[in-house]
A protein has these predicted regions:
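A structural signal for short, well-ordered beta-strand segments and their strand-loop junctions
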Residues: 73, 116, 135, 144-146
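A short SAM/SAH-binding and catalytic strip from SAM-dependent methyltransferases
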Residues: 113-124
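A short glycine-rich, Lys/Arg-flanked "PGG" loop and its adjoining helix->strand segment in the class I
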Residues: 127-139
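Conserved class I S-adenosyl-L-methionine
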Residues: 142-174
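Glycine-rich, histidine-containing beta strand-loop boundary motifs that form or position
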Residues: 75-76, 98, 118, 147-149
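Conserved N-terminal segment of class I S-adenosyl-L-methionine
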Residues: 1-107, 113
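Conserved catalytic-core segments centered on acid/base and nucleophilic motifs
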Residues: 71, 122, 136
């Protein structure tokens, strides 16, 4: 299996604690616009079917689902899927799958589009994960991906600062939410 159990459990806990329900709607819509502004909506066929790989809380799916016929929301974390189901309960065109990127039950070559934002770099073999996603797409179908960059070419001090901020982020994520 091409996933890290600790990462899956950690993000499941984070999505459960911070389910995006208190985030300002205008802020979420602006974030969606920044990520999806280059997505080629106009090339999608009528009644498109696609996937959100690593859907988390469903924050992107809530904006994509109204534009498509069917959206497959995939996540390896049951906790994340529970949050996504709750957040997307009014979207009757979302189908939820608990699966890792390499065992997704979508047929190869069947999807009109796909996206995975901020997810695949957390998978042990990122290249294999990307290949698994692309394999699900019809020929020429668009796939929007956002990967965090590698620290390989960064100086040691930069990596140390990042580690401190990451530890701080993890600690804050575990604080109780009022």
């Amino acid at each position: 299996m091409n996933y890290d159990k600790e990462t899956v459990e950690g993000f499941g806990q984070e999505w459960q604690a911070f389910d995006q329900s208190s985030v300002d709607e205008h802020e979420l819509h602006a974030l969606f616009g920044r990520y999806f502004d280059l997505f080629p909506w106009r090339v999608l066929p009528e009644n498109p079917v696609g996937f959100d790989m690593g859907c988390g809380s469903g924050r992107w799916a809530r904006f994509v689902a109204p534009r498509v016929d069917t959206l497959h929301c995939v996540d390896a974390s049951q906790r994340a899927l529970d949050v996504a189901r709750r957040n997307l309960r009014e979207m009757n065109n979302c189908v939820f799958h608990r699966a890792s990127v390499d065992d997704t039950p979508l047929p190869d070559g069947s999807m009109d589009f796909g996206y995975s934002l901020g997810v695949l770099h957390h998978v042990p073999d990122t290249a294999a994960a990307l290949t698994a996603c692309v394999r699900k797409l019809k020929p020429g179908a668009p796939f929007l991906v956002y990967l965090y960059y590698s620290f390989d070419n960064r100086p040691g001090w930069y990596r140390r600062v990042w580690r401190v901020t990451d530890i701080t982020r993890r600690m804050i994520s575990r604080l109780p939410f009022p």
